[in-house]
Amino acid sequence: MNSPVDRILIFDTTLRDGEQSPGATLTVEEKLSIARALARLGVDIIEAGFPFASPGDFEAVQKIAQTVGTENGPVICGLARATQKDIKAAAEALKPAAKHRIHTFLATSDIHLEHKLKKTRAEVLAIVPEMVAYAKSLVNDIEFSPEDAGRSDPEFLYQVLEAAISAGATTINIPDTVGYTTPAEYGALIKGIADNVPNIDQAIISVHGHNDLGLAVANFLEAVKNGARQLECTINGIGERAGNAALEELVMALHVRRSYFNPFLGRPADSTAPLTNIDTKHIYATSRLVSELTGMMVQPNKAIVGANAFAHESGIHQDGVLKNKLTYEIMDAESIGLTNNQIVLGKLSGRNAFGTRLKELGFDLSDTELNNAFIRFKEVADKRKEITDWDLEAIVNDEIRQPPELFRLERVQVSCGEPSVPTATLTIRTPAGPEETAVAIGTGPVDAVYKAINQIVQLPNELLEYSVTSVTEGIDALGKVSVRLRHNGVIYTGYAANTDIIVASARAYLGALNRLYAALEKSREHPPVVASL
């Protein structure tokens, strides 16, 4: 097999499949931030998007190729359906990258052929090699995926894969598109491909799976035992429906259980060489970044990166951990970059100390962004005695990583209490330029603020979720507000942090509305194209 026998390749699709999560829409700048973090993490391939889907997707893939796709950086990949228009757009967007890959796909299951593609098996067998060969004429590194491989007839699947490899595919990816298979079934599927596709030695076997039954990670680990050498995954497991296989869970499973998996890669069981290229100390920071930018909070009991992953409530467990961590912990929290050794800054801290700490925390800011974040830091430091790493993260995300402020909050004031009626007065600068002021009453101060905003913005929506969390302890702590709203079936998120919860609430809601407004403007110009796998 033409595989990296010494390790497993990590193919991250957070920016493509992960962004298909409801409400996870990202701006170009946010995608760049995540791409930089993924490169720092050490992923081998970044699937940057679906260039043909929209001008915004094309621009994002192109910019990631320009800035992250360096000679020493990851391979930058673009998704394309098995059509010349899609493939040509992907090749064009990927041109700036030193190492680039086109990932093209076509369904092979009978249910997809009959109900979605309206094509016969013979037609699919003709299209696949033709489109792979066309992609190969533009880019040397080609990945082909038979969509819904998990429910495809194995004998037909073998024929399609053989044809794709003969036409130039260098990676063959096997998607469990609907998360239907069990580990034993998926492992057998991979073994069947390894044993029955005559030219499989000319390609790397990759796996891609969804988590509808909660089995994606288990399926992938079984696939590794049967010959898979590339794992397609996302940070925090985000993705359509129940999500994708979680990168952090796969990497740490291979890291912690290295001696178990080593023999399947032809290594001695006691080999200490890493099984992946991932720098695990960047896992936690990358997880936090993706969570903040997508608005998708990580559940507390989530493996590896959840808030409770290294917490112990039971007295027996606490006693054991204090005596020896290994009594109840199979990995060190510091191995994923989670540490309590925080540096505390204050209002006398200078710009250099501030910038240095941000770099240590994994932030890569331009001079302008750093200046803006430092101004905001000083404002918060005047209200708080100490600024922790969590505060810094919230400040940067709130100040720098926001959608364009098409509607900008200028002033907000509320009055409330017993027995008065909660009333909000606010002023917003609109995209057209002038300021508009509105006054509204509500059941509470936040409700009044949101009603006043709606008077000005006038974008019909349904508020699905409003949550407030404290960034750190203390009555003067920063409060972080997250908002999710729905418009015409599409979910948009907003977040903001401030020591004043009313201000944070207003900015978070406006952030979601700004995303909605921008999306509506784009869709009027270019209706989006939806991918799958």
UniProtKB/Swiss-Prot annotation:
| Enzyme class at the top of the EC tree | transferase
Gene transcribed to yield this protein: leuA
Where, in this chain's numbering, is Mn(2+) bound?
Answer: 17, 208, 210, 244
Reactions it catalyzes: 3-methyl-2-oxobutanoate + acetyl-CoA + H2O = (2S)-2-isopropylmalate + CoA + H(+)
Q: What is this protein called?
A: 2-isopropylmalate synthase
Taxonomy of the source species: Bacteria, Bacillati, Cyanobacteriota, Cyanophyceae, Synechococcales
This protein's major location comes to cytoplasm
Q: Which residues form a coiled coil?
A: none
InterPro entries, from UniProt?
2-IPM_HCS-like, 2-isopropylmalate_synth_dimer, AIPM/Hcit_synth_CS, Aldolase_TIM, LeuA/HCS_post-cat, LeuA_allosteric_dom_sf, LeuA_bact_synth, PYR_CT
A GO molecular function annotation here is: manganese ion binding
Q: Ranges for the Pyruvate carboxyltransferase domain?
A: 8-269
Similarity comment: family membership = Belongs to the alpha-IPM synthase/homocitrate synthase family. LeuA type 1 subfamily.
What species was this sequence derived from?
Synechocystis sp. (strain ATCC 27184 / PCC 6803 / Kazusa)
Q: Name one Pfam family in it.
A: HMGL-like
What is the annotated quaternary arrangement, including any partners?
Answer: Homodimer.
Q: Name one GO cellular component term.
A: cytoplasm
PROSITE patterns, per database record: AIPM_HOMOCIT_SYNTH_1 (PS00815), AIPM_HOMOCIT_SYNTH_2 (PS00816), PYR_CT (PS50991)
Q: PANTHER family from the entry?
A: 2-ISOPROPYLMALATE SYNTHASE 1, CHLOROPLASTIC-RELATED, HOMOCITRATE SYNTHASE-RELATED
